[in-house]
UniProtKB/Swiss-Prot annotation:
Its EC number is 6.1.1.19. PANTHER family: ARGININE--TRNA LIGASE, CYTOPLASMIC, ARGINYL-TRNA SYNTHETASE. This is Arginine--tRNA ligase. Keywords: Aminoacyl-tRNA synthetase, ATP-binding, Cytoplasm, Ligase, Nucleotide-binding, Protein biosynthesis. GO terms for cellular component: cytoplasm. It catalyses: tRNA(Arg) + L-arginine + ATP = L-arginyl-tRNA(Arg) + AMP + diphosphate. It is found in: Cytoplasm. NCBIfam families: argS. A motif ('HIGH' region) lies at residues 127-137. Monomer. Belongs to the class-I aminoacyl-tRNA synthetase family. The gene is argS. GO terms for biological process: arginyl-tRNA aminoacylation. Its main location: cytoplasm.
Length: 567
């Protein structure tokens, strides 16, 4: 309906242009759903937008626009509201058509081709394989997976990718942590990984030969001097003593943790088309090649034995090291190579979803893209805020090194996948989130996911008791009470809500809409009877709630949440 209103407004503005009232008619005309039924179904601010250019006050211009609209059977009336809004009241016959459209299109209703098949590479989570995913990763996972689903629903082709940080010093710290647990030394570095999962991995390498010959007791003295230098010495000594067995331990640790991450994500309903290894960039020499390319372009200089990239030339606040004085490439060098590799795959758009703690990393990544002569606007970076998890009113701590973090798996086991997926995306991604476990587990109207699922289950219960209504000779005009009008108005909003959620990367908009729709249904359920003697009214009401049910299913599916038939 919005498209039709835009069309008739455009025709009216063209007439005013021909009459000399306007110099030119705009291409884009904004139409919004009204919040108050007394203000109509849709409203446009076009008169206020064009008032200054026309030399007319908004209400006068609005009247001229209305006078040129002509007759339209889809519109009951058009009114002007202060300070110049044009409000459209849609005819009841037009409004109720949405019910048949939803039922006929079923799971396809709401889908669009706005994206026209544009290809998007969406990278998200990409947590280091140094431990299980925690609840913070869970929010990024739920957000990323839902954004991907929404974009696909409006016509984009989306590939989900996980960047595996399986190279560098953190991997060595992981290997030494596992080995020290294997040899059961009493001394353990404070900056090693200490979770129970480290012990579990260590048990799996008990059969490897010669692993009982390792580091002298003197060299494992706890935190001797500088902690970072100490663990680096342990790593170097471990590599020397173990030889090829060191890589066996490292590979075992990475593969075990990565396998757990993959299982966790699949069970959470988060699927990836591609897993990209950082180590592959090292093995292929791409990181080295990129630094050489930047060097040849004059963007690299040497200082204090290290190689620095002049990112300040491209808007960054500081220059950045790409090769340390020991000759090792930094994570930033790998990230530059990775992003270049992404750009060369031919996607129309590249989206990274990062934790908000990576905010300072945006400028340097954008700088590297510009330096390599690519369009940095092709890359969008979305940030997700931290999660505060509360259990029994107490905030839980999350720290990978200490091993005391709450894992995503533990959260899912406690509240269930549906509650976790829904709660994670219920607030804007840029806002801090307080995850209330007690609320997520409650079976009450205050729990939004329960509230929505209960609406679906209630509809299923009614339909089980009723004979299947026939679309033949259906008369939807009998749906004329206030509750029915509100439900029909909400159903008419779904397409716009879906597109807005997708194009603005805002799943919470769809989640909040579903909660509102469920609320209107519950009110209708409490105040109305469905299995009435009047067949015409009975069938119309059943078709209305079938349409509501379909929208609840469609919306929940996009959010990665189930729609149970009973609760």
């Amino acid at each position: 309906m919005k498209e039709q209103l835009q069309k008739i407004l455009k025709q009216s503005l063209n007439l005013l242009e021909n009459e000399g009232v306007l110099e030119s008619a705009p291409e884009n005309i904004r139409i919004d759903h009204t919040k108050d039924k007394t203000q109509g179904d849709f409203a446009s601010n076009i008169a206020m937008v064009l008032a200054k250019r026309s030399g007319l006050i908004p209400k006068v211009l609005a009247q001229k626009i209305i006078d040129n609209l002509g007759d339209n059977t889809q519109i009951d009336k058009v009114q002007i509201a202060d300070p110049g809004f044009i409000n459209f009241f849609i005819s009841q016959g037009e409004s109720v058509q949405i019910i048949e459209q939803i039922i006929n299109q079923a799971e396809h209703y709401g889908k669009a081709d706005v994206g026209k098949g544009q290809r998007i590479l969406l990278e998200f989570v990409s947590a280091n394989p140094t431990g299980p995913l925690h609840v913070g990763h869970g929010r990024v996972a739920a957000y990323g997976a839902t954004v991907a689903s929404l974009l696909r629903a409006v016509g984009f082709e989306v590939d989900n990718e996980y960047y595996v940080n399986d190279a560098g010093r953190q991997m060595d710290i992981l290997a030494i942590s596992v080995y020290l647990r294997y040899v059961e030394t009493e001394q353990f570095p404070d900056n090693g990984y200490k979770g129970d999962y480290i012990f579990d991995i260590a048990k799996k390498i008990s059969g490897v030969k010669k692993l009982d010959i390792f580091i002298s007791q003197r060299s494992v003295k706890k935190n001797a001097g500088n902690k970072e230098k100490h663990i680096d010495r342990l790593i170097a000594n471990c590599k020397f003593q173990l030889g090829h067995d060191y890589k066996k331990i490292l590979d075992l640790a990475i593969n075990n943790i990565l396998s757990g991450i993959k299982i966790d994500l699949v069970e959470f309903g988060v699927k990836y088309q591609q897993w990209f290894s950082e180590q592959s960039l090292m093995d292929s020499g791409l990181s080295k090649e990129i630094v050489k390319k930047l060097q040849d372009s004059g963007y690299i200089y040497e200082k204090e034995g290290a190689l620095w990239f002049k990112t300040t030339d491209f808007g960054d606040d500081l220059d950045r090291v790409v090769v340390r004085k020991n000759g090792k490439y930094t994570y930033f060098a790998s990230d530059i190579a990775y992003h270049l590799e992404k750009f060369e795959r031919g996607y129309d758009k590249i989206i990274n979803i990062w934790g908000v703690d990576h905010h300072g990393y945006i400028a340097r990544i954008k700088a590297s893209i510009k330096a390599l002569n690519h369009n940095s606007n092709k890359l969008e970076i979305l940030l997700v805020q931290f999660v505060n998890l509360f259990r029994n009113g107490k905030k839980a701590s999350m720290s990978t090194r200490s091993g005391s973090f709450i894992t995503l798996e533990e959260l899912r086991e406690e509240v269930g996948n549906d509650a976790a997926r829904f709660f994670y995306i219920l607030s804007k991604s840029g806002q801090h989130m307080n995850f209330d476990l007690d609320l997520a587990k409650s079976k009450s109207n205050e729990n939004p996911v329960f509230y929505i699922q209960y609406a679906h289950a209630r509809i299923c219960s009614v339909l089980k008791q009723a004979k299947s209504p026939s679309m033949v000779d259906i008369d939807l005009s009998v749906l004329n009470n206030e509750s029915e009008a509100l439900l029909i108005k909400e159903l008419n909003r779904y397409k716009d809500i879906l597109q807005s959620s997708a194009l603005n990367y805002e799943p919470h908009v769809l989640a909040c809409y579903l909660r509102e729709l469920a609320g209107h249904f519950h009110s209708y359920y409490n105040n109305s009877k469905f299995l009435v003697d009047d067949d015409k009214l009975r069938n119309a009401r059943l078709f209305l709630i079938i349409a509501v049910k379909q929208i609840l299913v469609n919306g929940l599916n996009l959010l990665g949440v189930s729609a149970p038939d009973s609760m």
